[in-house]
């Protein structure tokens, strides 16, 4: 008896995205030579027909660009946030606040 734990749908959707990305990346047409200079001036009909039947090569390229930009923004944002949080000037555990600040008034 098989039980579904919720990762199966995630796996299927990830597989579909990777399959679509793979077909997008590998759907380019190879350059085929034409019929030759002596056999006519028309274009290679096989290449033209094949190109017309395939979907556009860059149909989903904007999604890839947005994905890369999003990852870059998250990386830079986390670096900036981590740096600013680590550089807090007025920390209560600072030795100045613990030992020196209260004793200066006694002198």
Swiss-Prot record:
**Region feature (Disordered):** 31-54
The alphabetized UniProt keywords are: Cell membrane, Cell projection, Cytoplasm, Glycoprotein, Ion transport, Membrane, Potassium, Potassium transport, Transmembrane, Transmembrane helix, Transport
Spell out the subcellular localization from the entry: Cell membrane; Cytoplasm; Perikaryon; Cell projection, Dendrite
What segment(s) does the record annotate as region Interaction with KCNQ1? 72-83
Any one Gene Ontology BP term: membrane repolarization during action potential
Entry GO terms, CC: basolateral part of cell; cytoplasm; dendrite; membrane raft; neuronal cell body membrane; perikaryon; plasma membrane; vesicle
Q: Which residues cross the membrane?
A: 61-81
Q: Which residues lie on this side of the membrane: Cytoplasmic?
A: 82-103
Q: How does it sit in the membrane?
A: Single-pass type I membrane protein
* Leader sequence segment: none
Which GO terms label this protein's molecular function in UniProt? Answer: potassium channel regulator activity; transmembrane transporter binding; voltage-gated potassium channel activity
User: Where do glycans attach?
Assistant: 5, 22, 45
Protein family membership: Belongs to the potassium channel KCNE family.
What does the annotation say about its assembly with partners?
Answer: Interacts with KCNB1. Interacts with KCNC2. Associates with KCNC4/Kv3.4. Interacts with KCNQ1; associates with a KCNQ1:KCNE3 stoichiometry of 4:4; produces a current with nearly instantaneous activation with a linear current-voltage relationship and alters membrane raft localization; affects KCNQ1 structure and gating properties.
For this entry, the protein name equals Potassium voltage-gated channel subfamily E member 3
Q: Which organism is it from?
A: Rattus norvegicus
